[in-house]
Amino acid sequence: MYYNMQVHSAYDLLNSTIKYESLFSKLIKDNQKSVVIVDPNMYGAIKAHKEAKKSGVNLIQGLEVSLGYGIGLLKFNILCKSEKMFYKLLEISTKFMNEEEWTVENFANEVIDYKDDFVLIIVDELRDSMEFSYLNNLI
């Protein structure tokens, strides 16, 4: 069984035009039982939850994160394993929108108390990088 681990929705304006209604209809049609939505914000999270519940598809909420590291960015997805983490992601997403730049240290300080409630998904080219090792050690 195939599960898409990185769906972006229309709430990620520059990366997707997928609306939740059509997404969940397509998932049902294709007999997919789960989906992971990882937009760079949580604007559509409640609507996605309602559509998932209505359709019977298991939704894993996530957030695409870009952190300043040196002169570059460290990008990864953080996925919720609990309702507690879902609310923390809502809070983090709001803080991202209100502050200029987040660092690896800022992010680690925000999530350190929740380390059993989330999963980090790192893109392959970063898996062995110094940046990922640094983030992993902080958390």
Predicted stretch roles:
Residues 1-139:
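Phosphodiester-processing cores and adjacent nucleic acid-binding clamps
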